[in-house]
């Protein structure tokens, strides 16, 4: 694509490789080696290139505007590693230093200057991983995500975050030890304020300086792939930092943001919203995400704050209705459809995940049926209900038992991911451990029960760092995790439990093979509110099944009976109350044979001891012939709720 064609397609919103044209690029012009700098500022009066190579003199290197509003200059003064900015004379004559929106590196905070960088071509060694990803996809594969804030998983003795070179040496072995299938990073793009956690971005094409060089993150991803771990990154295409020297009103007029003040300003987050209907902004954002997938071989993208992009009244502030008088942001709706269409056409095996909390729009449905085309949607309703239930005193749980059963009424309305994310362990919400009811023993028991329920419930999984070993304090983004907690035997046992639970998930296909239809689950009993016990069966494609029973109160139930559709000899393969995990049971239940007898709509029964505040999972060891093997008729009732 020549320069003029690149500009034309930029203006029509069809240039998805914009970073190869705009920004700083090494070139040879008339036999002279140097760098060409280009920036889009259509309404600026003048733009000058300034940096280390001009001693920051503002008028030394003027740039020339073309017919498309892009300013350009070639210079042999700039060298690799030099810091630079653009000195923009805005439409009103006001002058301001601005970042290069297409830079691939920036200086360390509090500076915001771009660094002249030509990304080296990496010789990747993850071909086997990519081939498997392409062949297997992810819909019928285990997806169990460890969510990480790269700046606070661990820190150096001086308080600085680990670089990706350090994370490669320590975090990847930890992921392997803990048996996760994927890691998801909170935003890694350049951001001016650490306290934003990366959700108010400045440089969309650049790795945050504090995390090291781009090559270090490439090596990290490659090493993850070597160990069969996928890498997902959060991305924020809805809003950006309001800082004057970043994207905000770049040339003095709305450039990346909306013209309409109500649509442009996000009062709740103190940010600016992208004009998602503007062609140039669409080119910018889609180019950004393709850059991250191509340069870093990412396996998934989680799109943050989708509701903010879809609803004009999402912010608790004055808002402007759409042309039909409603609150749907048509620009955001059509942009998200187009984004997923473009990404899926080129990268069908890269996961697109939406963090979205409403239920009005089909998020994971295809464009043809009015959906947005995402692969997965965070199930925020399930998460809120289940946490509320587990925080409650067990005495009252029978009155709110619908909090754990309601999800079965809509479980396949979307393709869901079940998140216990960073948002649930900050701002006074308490850590996952601290949320649990009771004394310290019961809190650990409740957490083991909860995590087992998450693993057994249909949907992909996500857990925020520190939650796997029961950190008691809330997450603090400016400090490392409370690793000293592991000196306590209970926390150490909790960590071991989490690692074994993750392996249990990977080992049993029925827990992930059919995650999007009722073919993968059969409800045994969702009505036992008096005892607060829930039971269901997870099913695989080749007849594998696990019987999952959850006792959600601290009362052991001897001779507990449930009905089953298949006669046989069953063995307990999971019990959250084993002593090695912090419980009091020294061993599993004994193997049990089903008995013929009417139980609800079943004519086979299984009787065993159900541990207090425990989850018990059973697997058929040997099938037995029976003339009275039936399927739960109530299952059709659940299906009819779809």
UniProtKB/Swiss-Prot annotation:
Molecular function as annotated in GO: 1,4-alpha-glucan branching enzyme activity; cation binding; hydrolase activity, hydrolyzing O-glycosyl compounds
Keywords (A to Z) from UniProt: Carbohydrate metabolism, Glycogen biosynthesis, Glycogen metabolism, Glycosyltransferase, Transferase
Pfam family, one: CBM_48
Record flagged with keyword Glycosyltransferase: yes
Organism, scientific name: Streptococcus pneumoniae serotype 4 (strain ATCC BAA-334 / TIGR4)
UniProt superkingdom: Bacteria
EC number: 2.4.1.18
Catalytic activity line of the entry: Transfers a segment of a (1->4)-alpha-D-glucan chain to a primary hydroxy group in a similar glucan chain
Residue numbers annotated as active site: 304, 355
Family statement: Belongs to the glycosyl hydrolase 13 family. GlgB subfamily.
GO terms (BP aspect): glycogen biosynthetic process
Known partners and oligomeric status: Monomer.
Protein name: 1,4-alpha-glucan branching enzyme GlgB
SMART domains, per database record: Aamy (SM00642)
Function: Catalyzes the formation of the alpha-1,6-glucosidic linkages in glycogen by scission of a 1,4-alpha-linked oligosaccharide from growing alpha-1,4-glucan chains and the subsequent attachment of the oligosaccharide to the alpha-1,6 position.
GO cellular component, one term: cytosol
Pathway terms, separated by semicolons: Glycan biosynthesis; glycogen biosynthesis
